[in-house]
Amino acid sequence: KVGGKTWYSRTGKHGGGDKMKFKEFRKKNVGLLLILPWWIGFAIFKLYPFISSLIYSFHDYNLFRTATFSGLSNYKKILGDPLIMKAFIQTFKYAFLTVPLELIFALFIAYILNFKIKGVNFFRTAYYIPSILGGSVSIAVLWRFLFKTEGLVNMIASRFGIQPFNWLGDPGGAFWVIVFLKIWQFGSPMVIFLAALKGVSKDLYEAASIDGAGKWRQFFSVTIPLITPVIFYNFVTQLCNKFQEFNGPFIVTQGGPLRSTTLVSLLVYNNAFKSYEMGMASAIAWLLFLIIMTLTGVAFFSQKYWVYYSDEDGR
């Protein structure tokens, strides 16, 4: 015993020092330990496939033969294949049709539901449900029933003297079916628009009303400018989603007829899991990724011309 302390207490041989160090380490790194499972999952299911697909895109890789480096040959095949280019054109057409139509419809419904009307909570839920069920098999069956030759849509049209139309058998008709399906799933942007509308101060509407502005003038001069950040957010997220659309064409039309509804995501699926051409599928996916990133960059660049952000004082 030296200086009132035993040899064990001074040297920490009893393990107390190690315990203190462990507790201190745990206290400082508890956050890292908590997110470690997420990082492991991210690395396995996101990061590894992301990097692997980039490598595969430069290889002639089929599940049934050894991968060989092929450079840019997959990308050259994509640019030279009219069927693949048709899928890209159809995807552009699909995205730039559905995004504005869906957002306009979502904003219109959100504007109506923003008023104090009876049963508003029921309607909010009812309008949101399709966005949850849009990719289910039951919705595919329902949509086929609605648009088949003897379906409900043609039955209603016949009441007005319109001849039945083979929606799912006609290339143009089938394309509009999947467009209508996606517009019908406007629930997610509607909820976001509704939250933005509730954030607009009533004082601004009162001031505009005093200046003689009617409802329409208030909507376009007060409401729209103040919710442009939300419009921008919905536009970017929906544009990215539409370029990656898979469920609608897959479960309703299977890409037909005559490949009229074969979008790029479905093309990636067909190459990867039907033809087992993983190299080609990866190249198509990466080309789609570059297109989405480019369009997103253009959207972010354009926001300074039309998106209104209030300053720190809320002005």
For each predicted feature, which ranges?
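A structural signal for multi-pass alpha-helical bundles of membrane permease subunits
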Residues: 23-315
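A composition-driven signal for long, intrinsically disordered, charge-rich low-complexity tracts
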Residues: 5-11, 263, 284
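Short, Lys/Arg-rich, polar N-terminal cytosolic tail immediately upstream
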Residues: 6-26
